[in-house]
Amino acid sequence: MIHGVLNVYKEKGYTSHDVVAKLRGIVKQKKIGHTGPLDPDAEGVLPVSFGKATKLCDLLTDKDKTYQAVLLLGQVTDTQDTSGQVLEKHSTEDLTNEKVENVIRSFEGEYDQIPPMYSALKVNGKKLYELAREGKEVERKARRITIHEIRILEINLPEVKLEVTCSKGTYIRTLCHDIGQKLGCGGCMKELLRTRVERFGLEDSIRLGEIAQLQKEGILEEKIIAIDEMFPTYAQVVLPPKTAAAVRNGNSFRKRDISQETALKEYENDERVRVYDESHQFIAIYCYCRKDDLFKIVKMFFDGNEKK
């Protein structure tokens, strides 16, 4: 079984679930999960976790993301992108590049974004897009998100090409809609390309066809990033056999329990570390609590089927 993360390039026309289903067929492995959905009409970086790395999905979903998007001004749709039904059309003749730039840049920083009806968020156990398809609209709570940076790549009205770096939970479709509303002419998203999720960029992403070929040649695992390599900034902690056995059961441990080779480091409060046994088998991610002088479990990656 493969354990690790693969940087997949999701092509247009596929849902993120479609990508996972196709990968299961390619590698003949069920335990696969993606780390944050992309709309079917969007494309770009989609990190996919295999085997024990599926425990990473929530950790990767929390990471900042970067997108390139094309904003179409003068048009409002029910889906907030050009795939939806047009609800309004307005002239953009009075817009100037300067006004557009100023309004777009005003969205940098934190703002309360209302999720779109056409989204996978659930209300009372039902997905919003299912309600939307039934012609229903329900009240959605605004969510505080952060737009770290917006770069305006090109203005060719009524279209504007943007690069957006943002926090988790940000809907670029909704950002486009909100920019249009603030400009007074409406707007929607025409194109979306996700260019980065944390360490994963377009430059090393792999399309499904290439993945199938690599698997056929028996070299796909060369492209898989090992679980512990996903945390390159975390210090490594090596444990002697007795402590390692306890840690495999999720027990906490103290600094004095660490093998000599990694015991000399001073650990900050709440610092996360990668925990290994003396054969350098990766076990878990732990966090140091200075008050108790204890390392406490964050995420376990060892399972009982592995050799100890």
Give the ranges of each region predicted by the language model.
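Conserved glycine(s) of the Walker
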Residues: 171
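Accessory RNA 3′-end/elbow-binding domains used by RNA modification enzymes
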Residues: 1-12, 17-38, 42-45, 98, ...
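Catalytic cores of RNA-modifying enzymes
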Residues: 1-167, 177-206
